[in-house]
Amino acid sequence: MDIRVDRKAFAGHTVLHDINLSLQTGEIVSLLGPSGCGKSTLLRIVAGLEQDFRGSVERIQGQVAFVFQEPRLMPWLTVEQNIGFSDDNGYDRKWVSQLIEEVGLSGFANALPKALSGGMAQRVAIARGLYSHPTILLLDEPFSAVDAFTRMKLQDLLLQLAERHAITLLLVTHDVDEALYLSDRVLVMGSRPGTITHELPVGLQTPRDRRDPLLARLKAEALTELHQAQVI
């Protein structure tokens, strides 16, 4: 997928400017930057949810799916029904059952959202994102609302699912450690207007050890770039 955003404005105010981004098949890329720099807007452009901009998006064949910061589950539907909700022709129960097992929610197919923890609800949201067999999965701060331990487990789950289904991930995050742990590349964004100021290749094999000193060095580099981009 190739994305070019020459300019995106709201009420005459430029929020994104001069962005060129290519996503390779099976690649995991994180967008890292401050609130208000346009990360989520860029994600919406990639998803096709925002079309009022100057530029272009050239998609590869296949579906693009979106996982939001909040699970956004229908409270009156079961886990199974929430995962297959987008299918107007009646959902594929066998596929839904497989996804429920893959995200670690076996035994909860008939549970309502009120019976789920925050981490469990986000597992449902990820399964719902995978239901359409996407080639690209877009995630907007998907783990920001859960505790640190749950976040680490969900990060590992996401990596397993991405490898199993051979999908490309584009992730928005404020968490430097998360970006480096998950990604093949980290793109630092500055603001006013939002643009990509630095690309940081991670270049480490997966699965990664969170204690790897190379990750610490990359974190120092990322923090330097964020500082130079006037993010911190």
Swiss-Prot record:
Part of the ABC transporter complex SsuABC involved in aliphatic sulfonates import. Responsible for energy coupling to the transport system. It is found in: Cell inner membrane. It catalyses: ATP + H2O + aliphatic sulfonate-[sulfonate-binding protein]Side 1 = ADP + phosphate + aliphatic sulfonateSide 2 + [sulfonate-binding protein]Side 1. PROSITE patterns: ABC_TRANSPORTER_1 (PS00211), ABC_TRANSPORTER_2 (PS50893), SSUB (PS51291). Residues 1-216 form the ABC transporter domain. The lineage of its organism: Bacteria, Pseudomonadati, Pseudomonadota, Gammaproteobacteria, Pseudomonadales. It is an enzyme of class 7 (translocase). InterPro entries: AAA+_ATPase, ABC_transporter-like_ATP-bd, ABC_transporter-like_CS, ABC_transporter_ATP-bind, P-loop_NTPase. Its EC number is 7.6.2.14. PANTHER family: ALIPHATIC SULFONATES IMPORT ATP-BINDING PROTEIN SSUB 2, TAURINE IMPORT ATP-BINDING PROTEIN-RELATED. Its main location: membrane. ATP binds at G33, P34, S35, G36, C37, G38, K39, S40. Signal peptide: none annotated. Pfam families: ABC_tran. This is Aliphatic sulfonates import ATP-binding protein SsuB 2. Keywords: ATP-binding, Cell inner membrane, Cell membrane, Membrane, Nucleotide-binding, Translocase, Transport. One of its GO terms (cellular component) is plasma membrane.
